[in-house]
Amino acid sequence: MSTDPQTVNRTPSSLAGFGRFCQSTLLLLIRIYFFWQLFKIGLAKLENIATPIGFFTKLGIPFPEINAWVVACTECFGGILIVAGLATRLAAVPVTISMAVAYWVADSNAVLNIWGHPDKFVSAAEFPFFLAALIVLCFGPGWFSLDAIFGRLFRRKSED
């Protein structure tokens, strides 16, 4: 191991840079994998809106027509915005709320017993989308996103 001060001082920053690269890569993979699926689910709901309206009516959800449109649009447009990394955190807010409500409506027992029966909580169909939305909401889209590209462009212009 080198004790050269230049090497020692450079190592933490290069390790941190590698960590940021890995973080951004993981965020990109999460965005593409989960939110492309969510986009397709939302698009299918928009193409056949009668199905979610009927499902929401059967569940006793108030204003099933309005809620079906809101959920379908949130999943479709929120999903594609998050995949692109455009207005990512803003898009993640309604997606997170929608997944939380879906979780509660589909299986409130799993939500209430998260500590007693965590296997039931994490095996619910809503869990991966809810977790992915929380991750993107908390950590942002990473370097590989339109948000990051626009951020770099605007910073560069403001420095000129």
What does each model-found stretch correspond to?
Residues 1-47, 65-73, 77-80, 84-160:
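Extended, low-polarity transmembrane helix blocks
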Residues 49-62, 89:
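Short juxtamembrane and helix-loop transition motifs at transmembrane-helix boundaries
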